[in-house]
């Protein structure tokens, strides 16, 4: 199955050496958002709404949005469908990363990952520590790559989603960010 990688606004593979990168338009990525919750609805899903608002305001495209119960198999099924879709570049989940019995997002997503992005969880918890102090140790936020698709698993709180997007994801999902970003790596994620 062919994977469609983002290109620059002129339809060519993204350049990492062009001095005019920041003058170019953002390369819009297709981002799917999954809210993991037994109780949220479209009307009450503030964290999912925040992520959609932030990603579209930045210039990215919403590929799909879903609210999925706290069930590892349902989470895994939706994530697997998106991972298999070459038009979905990024998956962001919100919810289910805590320590309670129903929190199973890491258990659902981890087996699907080809590689983990350890730095994401580490930096996210460091940023969260500045806001919520030692409560940040309860977060099991994680990120990784599966079939060339980036997956970011965030806590369910709106504040955590805001921190993750504003402080990490917005820059790393912009190919103009230097010295490096995750988008530049996308064409090489399938190398063997």
Predicted regions and their residues:
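Non-catalytic beta/alpha edge segments that cap or flank active sites
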Residues: 2-192
């Amino acid at each position: 199955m062919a994977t469609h990688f983002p290109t620059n606004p002129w339809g060519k593979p993204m350049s990492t050496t062009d001095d005019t990168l920041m003058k170019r338009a953002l390369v819009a990525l297709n981002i799917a958002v999954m809210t993991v919750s037994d109780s949220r609805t479209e009307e009450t899903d503030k964290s999912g709404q925040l992520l959609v608002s932030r990603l579209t305001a930045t210039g990215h495209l919403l590929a799909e949005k879903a609210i999925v119960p706290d069930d590892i198999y349902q989470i895994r099924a939706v994530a697997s469908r998106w991972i298999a879709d070459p038009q979905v570049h990024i998956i962001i989940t919100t919810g289910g990363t805590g320590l309670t019995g129903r929190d199973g997002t890491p258990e659902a997503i981890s087996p699907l990952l080809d590689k983990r992005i350890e730095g994401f969880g580490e930096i996210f918890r460091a940023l969260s520590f500045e806001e919520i102090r030692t409560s940040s140790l309860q977060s099991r936020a994680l990120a990784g790559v599966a079939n060339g698709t980036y997956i970011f698993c965030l806590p369910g709180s709106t504040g955590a989603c805001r921190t993750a997007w504003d402080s990490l994801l917005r820059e790393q999902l912009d190919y103009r960010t230097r010295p490096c970003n995750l988008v530049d790596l996308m064409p090489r994620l399938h190398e063997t």
